C-alpha cells in the first residue's frame, strides 16, 4: 500500500498504527512508539539513500523459531515452527530506472537490472542473486516489474539461527507481491519463491521451513511430503500460559564459512535415500532403511547413517509434539524438545563443525543452559546448527536469573526473550 511519505510519518507519530504494531510486536499500544520510530527511520533512509520520493510502502517480515523437526524439511519431512516478534522492515518506492535498488543498513547498495534476470554463476552467495531470482520468479507468475527502491532495517541478528536470510527473502517477496501482483501470491507461494531463489540463484541447498514460518506466521506445523503443496496447519498455543518463556541464545559463532557443513547434511541424507531406492528419506520406510544399513555404511559412511537415524526419529516426534501442545501437555512437549536436541547433537551432528576444537560455541551454550535450568524446561540446538543459536524454554520464575547467568557467559544482549508473532510477512 503506497502513501505519501509525509502521510506515513504523520500517522506513525500520531499513533494511527498503534493497534497494528501492537499485534505485530506482541506488545501493548503504549509500547509501540519505538516500533513506529523504526518505520519512520526506514522512510528517512529511503530518501537519504535514493532521493525524494512522492510515495512509499512499508513492509515487515519476521524471524522464525524452529520448535520441532531439526533438518527434516529438506527430506520432505515434518516441522513445527513459528514466527517471532523480531523482524526485518522496509520502505519501498518506485523509480524510473527499471532497476531494483536495495540498501540494507550496514551493507553495500545492491542493484540489479530488471531486463536481465538470468542466474549468474559468479553471483552465487550474494544478495544480488536472491533479488534476481525472486524477481524472475515473480516475472514467471505474470508480474510486470518496474523500477523500485528499497531501504531495509533489521533487528533479526544475522547468522543467528532466527533466519535473517529467510526474513530477507520473505520481505522482498511481500514487497514484490504488493507492488506488482496486488497481493495475489499466497504466503505459501512467497515462501516457495524465496527457497527457489536461494537454491537456484544463491546456490545454497536449503529446505523450506525457514521461509514458510516467516511468511505464513504464528505457530504452524508443516508436512512437506508433497513438496509442491506442503500441508500447513495452525497450532494454537500460548507458552506464557504454561509458565514458559521462549529464549533464543546467541552463541556468538557465525555461519559465514559453514556452507559446506550445511550442504553435507541434505547431501548425505539423499545419498542414504538413494541407496534405499528413494530420492529423499521421506520416500524410504524406516524398515527399508534398517535393512539397508550395511550398504549405506559402505557407500555413504557412518555419519550419513546416523543422520538418517536422526531424521526418522525427529520426523516422528513432530506430530507427537503437536498433539502434546494441543492437549496442553507441556511436560510431554518439553521432554520431546530435549530428545530432539540430544538427537541433533549425537546423531545429526550439527552442534560442532567437523574438526573444530577451540571454537565450540553452540556446545558451550547448550551445556551452560542445561546447567542453569537444573533439569527444568528444555534446551536444544536451534535451526541449522554449527553456529548461531540455541533455543531454551525457561520457566518464567527462573527467567531473570537464567538470562543474567547466560549473558555473563555469552555477553550482554545474547539472550533474546521472544514472543510468537501472530502474522507472517506483512504490508503495514
Task: Show which residues each predicted segment covers.
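Alpha/beta catalytic cores of group-transfer enzymes, especially the acyltransferase/condensing modules
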Residues: 182-230, 235, 340, 366-369, ...
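Structural signature of FAD isoalloxazine-binding scaffolds in flavoprotein oxidoreductases
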Residues: 78-97, 216
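C-terminal nucleotide
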Residues: 1-64, 89, 93-124, 221-380, ...
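Phosphate-handling active-site elements
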Residues: 140-148, 176-190, 396-409
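Beta-strand segments within the central parallel beta-sheet cores of soluble alpha/beta enzyme folds
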Residues: 101-103, 147-154, 184-196, 334-339, ...
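Glycine/serine-rich anion-binding loops at beta->alpha junctions
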Residues: 60-76, 155-171, 375-393
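DPxDG-like acidic metal-binding loop motif
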Residues: 83-85, 162-182
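Glycine- and acidic-rich phosphate- and metal-coordinating loops
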Residues: 135-157
Amino acid at each position: 500500500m503506497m502513501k505519501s511519505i509525509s502521510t506515513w510519518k504523520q500517522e506513525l507519530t500520531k499513533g494511527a498504527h498503534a493497534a497494528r504494531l501492537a499485534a505485530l510486536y506482541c506488545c501493548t499500544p503504549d509500547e509501540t512508539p519505538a516500533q513506529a520510530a523504526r518505520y519512520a527511520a526506514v522512510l528517512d533512509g529511503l530518501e537519504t539513500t535514493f532521493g525524494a520520493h512522492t510515495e512509499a510502502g512499508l513492509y515487515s517480515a519476521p524471524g522464525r523459531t524452529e520448535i520441532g523437526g531439526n533438518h527434516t524439511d529438506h527430506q520432505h519431512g515434518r516441522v513445527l515452527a513459528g514466527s517471532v516478534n523480531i523482524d526485518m522492515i522496509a520502505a519501498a518506492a518506485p523509480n524510473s530506472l527499471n532497476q531494483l535498488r536495495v540498501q540494507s543498513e550496514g551493507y553495500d547498495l545492491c542493484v540489479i537490472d530488471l531486463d536481465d534476470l538470468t542466474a549468474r554463476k559468479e553471483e552465487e552467495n550474494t544478495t544480488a542473486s536472491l533479488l534476481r531470482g525472486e524477481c524472475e520468479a515473480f516475472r514467471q507468475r505474470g508480474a510486470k516489474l518496474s523500477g523500485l527502491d528499497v531501504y531495509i532495517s533489521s533487528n533479526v541478528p544475522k547468522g543467528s539461527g532466527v533466519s535473517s536470510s529467510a526474513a530477507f527473502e520473505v520481505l522482498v517477496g511481500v514487497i514484490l507481491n504488493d507492488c506488482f501482483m496486488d497481493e495475489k501470491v499466497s504466503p505459501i507461494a512467497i515462501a516457495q519463491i524465496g527457497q527457489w531463489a536461494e537454491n537456484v540463484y544463491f546456490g545454497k541447498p536449503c529446505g523450506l521451513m525457514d521461509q514458510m514460518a516467516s511468511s505464513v506466521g504464528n505457530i504452524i506445523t508443516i508436512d512437506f511430503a508433497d513438496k509442491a503443496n506442503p500441508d500447513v496447519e495452525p497450532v494454537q498455543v500460548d507458552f506464557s500460559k504454561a509458565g514458559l518463556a521462549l529464549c533464543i541464545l546467541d552463541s556468538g559463532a557465525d555461519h559465514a564459512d559453514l556452507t559446506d557443513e550445511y550442504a553435507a547434511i541434505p547431501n548425505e541424507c539423499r545419498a542414504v535415500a538413494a541407496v534405499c531406492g528413494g530420492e529423499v528419506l521421506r520416500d524410504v520406510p524406516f524398515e527399508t532403511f534398517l535393512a539397508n544399513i550395511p550398504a549405506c555404511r559402505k557407500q555413504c559412511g557412518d555419519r550419513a547413517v546416523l543422520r538418517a537415524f536422526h531424521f526418522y526419529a525427529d520426523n516422528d516426534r513432530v506430530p507427537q509434539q503437536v498433539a502434546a501442545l494441543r492437549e496442553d501437555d507441556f511436560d510431554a512437549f518439553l521432554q520431546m524438545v530435549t530428545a530432539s536436541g540430544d538427537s541433533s547433537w549425537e546423531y545429526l551432528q550439527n552442534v560442532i563443525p567437523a574438526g573444530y576444537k577451540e571454537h565450540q560455541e553452540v556446545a558451550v551454550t547448550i551445556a551452560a543452559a542445561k546447567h542453569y535450568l537444573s533439569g527444568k524446561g528444555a534446551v536444544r540446538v536451534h535451526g541449522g546448527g554449527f553456529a548461531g543459536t540455541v533455543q531454551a524454554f525457561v520457566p518464567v520464575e527462573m527467567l531473570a536469573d537464567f538470562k543474567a547467568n547466560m549473558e555473563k557467559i555469552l555477553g550482554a544482549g545474547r539472550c533474546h526473550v521472544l514472543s510468537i508473532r501472530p502474522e507472517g510477512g506483512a504490508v503495514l
